[in-house]
């Protein structure tokens, strides 16, 4: 959004982005931030429904591990929930959308669409992983390379691992 003096700083989209940018990074709810940005692209996205579904998935993953689980155990449960068919996900995994391998179809980058279709790309897949990982208390972030996004996960020893969500969430 190009904003010049007096041109649109009060526009709701600009205000939404300014509000996100005013939050200290450690306090950012990644899921809420991503859905806020997604709504700038598609205002028909129901943020409440999308965020509720992310919270439900996080709760389902939490139920797969003990209260005192390690980072590795929580990350393994997250990976398994998303990419392994089982009773925890009713046999419905999340997978790469080979019909849009370069991610040119913009709706495929939106979390609401990924949650609905379970077909994603190198934007929606790592961003859902990050949103869920944050809710599971994992230290994660996004890393980029040309035309690609992957996840950085810090383990209990402070070592960072690259997680490739488009190929089953393996380091």
Which residues fall in each region the model found?
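A structural boundary/capping signal
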Residues: 3-171
């Amino acid at each position: 959004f190009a904003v010049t003096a007096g041109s649109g700083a009060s526009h709701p989209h600009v205000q939404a982005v300014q509000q996100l940018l005013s939050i200290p990074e450690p306090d950012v709810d990644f899921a809420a931030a991503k859905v806020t940005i997604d709504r700038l692209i598609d205002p028909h996205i129901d943020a409440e429904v999308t965020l509720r579904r992310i919270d439900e998935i996080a709760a389902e993953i939490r139920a797969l591990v003990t209260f005192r689980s390690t980072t590795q155990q929580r990350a393994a449960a997250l990976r398994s929930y998303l990419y392994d068919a089982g009773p925890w996900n009713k046999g419905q995994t999340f997978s790469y959308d080979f019909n849009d391998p370069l991610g040119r179809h913009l709706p495929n980058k939106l979390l609401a669409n990924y949650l609905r279709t379970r077909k994603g790309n190198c934007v929606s897949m790592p961003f859902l992983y990050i949103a869920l990982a944050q809710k599971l208390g994992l230290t994660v972030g996004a890393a980029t390379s040309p035309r690609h996004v992957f996840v950085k996960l810090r383990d209990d020893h402070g070592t960072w691992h690259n997680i490739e969500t488009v190929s089953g969430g393996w380091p």
